Amino acid sequence: MKRPVITPRSRTFPRLRRRTAALAAVALSLVLTGTGCSGGGTPSPAAAGAAPKAAPVVSGPLCDLLPSGSDPGNPAALAGQPAEAALQWLPVLTTFEAAVRASGMSADLRGGSGVTILAPTDDAFAAKFSEDDLDHLLLADRDTLRGLLREHLVAGSRSLSDLVAAGKVTTLAGTTVTVTGGGGGSARLADRADTVCADYQVAGARIHIINHVLGNLPTTGGPGGHRAH
């Protein structure tokens, strides 16, 4: 059963708005980095001599199903965006993005020292919470929602290799999460979640998409977790 809209505003964005935003981002990129022309039409030395910047590389089994190449929302297009804006372009993170907005925690994703975001997929939220419980979290229990989101935030912008090398990290909720390397460019978190597309580089943050909701809230989702009638 398809879950109805449960956020203060639509959890998805019209294609026209996305396309307009993409065109605006391209135009801004061209102004900032593209032609580098002076008033006399001569390319600036910085623009003429700069080497092309390597495109961000994401890894994990879900990456092939997410925007890539020249698609809006591809890793390179998201690289300079604020985290809360970048989340809107990732189609498997509509619930997480809605939770960030509903909780009022967008500013927490723009911390000066950076942040690592362990973002569960929509399927992960559906497996964890019933539709009624998820509605309640998003619309009526802001404190619990903020606590849940802090279970998925780590201070500092850390790549997947950084997390694996550390072996464990502490979330903003104060929970210690173990991190072990896995195959196919993935990692295992808290012995229950795997990264499925890691290393989105956005402004001041890294986004790692994971397949399980972290934290200790009770599980009410799954096959029996549909909305009560």
Language-model features: where?
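Mature, structured domains of secreted/extracytosolic soluble proteins
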Residues: 2-229
